């Protein structure tokens, strides 16, 4: 994982699984190859193996459970997603919250397995406590803006700038910004404010031409990083 980080969360939209999921993945992969930029796709557990086999994108799970292997019906463990082909996992999304102790345990096992992790938080005050658990990145997403099309970089720029101040107190943990990220301009602004990348979902998954949305994201992410001299 290296900036600019572009993470697309497939969630559980109708095109997040099956043939439609493969189609949108291929479109995203084309953009990734054209611009030489890594794009992370966080996909349903049932699609991890298929997407990792049929594309060269970095595939993440959307969640993993804490706890050991054993009599744990329905659990999705780090060992399982690695075996399926995932290279990491999203954790603690506002739609799938977990306790801090569960987060710490999952992150430890993710590291042992040489997987990567992106942990979501809903406010800047949580950035440092979570970053101290040593994920690869912390994604700040004010929940009231998720799925609204109102970007955090415009509606709450201070959430990003304050989060940047917090992440600088740690080492080797990236800061991503999400919630309402819809256009390349939103991406540019988020990175200009100090984020190392972005997370998005509905802007891509609900788009008529998702490849154009992703291309807009990537072009502006690259431009913003160049402006920062990185």
From Swiss-Prot:
Q: Which SUPFAM superfamilies match?
A: Triosephosphate isomerase (TIM)
Gene3D superfamilies named among the record's database cross-references: Aldolase class I
In which pathway does this enzyme or protein participate? Carbohydrate biosynthesis; gluconeogenesis; Carbohydrate degradation; glycolysis; D-glyceraldehyde 3-phosphate from glycerone phosphate: step 1/1
Broad EC category? isomerase
| Family matches, as PROSITE patterns | TIM_2
Q: Which CDD domains does the record match to this protein?
A: TIM (cd00311)
Database matches in Pfam families = TIM (PF00121)
UniProt keywords (A-Z) are: Cytoplasm, Gluconeogenesis, Glycolysis, Isomerase
Name the Enzyme Commission number(s) assigned to this protein.
5.3.1.1
Q: Where is the active site?
A: 93, 141
The entry marks the following residues as binding substrate, namely: 9-11, 146, 180, 201-202
Principal location listed in the UniProt entry: cytoplasm
Provide one Gene Ontology biological process annotation. Answer: glyceraldehyde-3-phosphate biosynthetic process
Keyword flag Magnesium = no
- Tell me a Gene Ontology molecular-function term this record carries: triose-phosphate isomerase activity
Which subcellular locations apply to this protein? Cytoplasm
Assembly information from the UniProt record: Homotetramer; dimer of dimers.
Q: Which family does it belong to?
A: Belongs to the triosephosphate isomerase family.
* Protein name stated in the entry: Triosephosphate isomerase
From what organism does this protein derive?
Answer: Sulfolobus acidocaldarius (strain ATCC 33909 / DSM 639 / JCM 8929 / NBRC 15157 / NCIMB 11770)
Per the UniProt record, the lineage of the source organism begins with:
Archaea, Thermoproteota, Thermoprotei, Sulfolobales, Sulfolobaceae
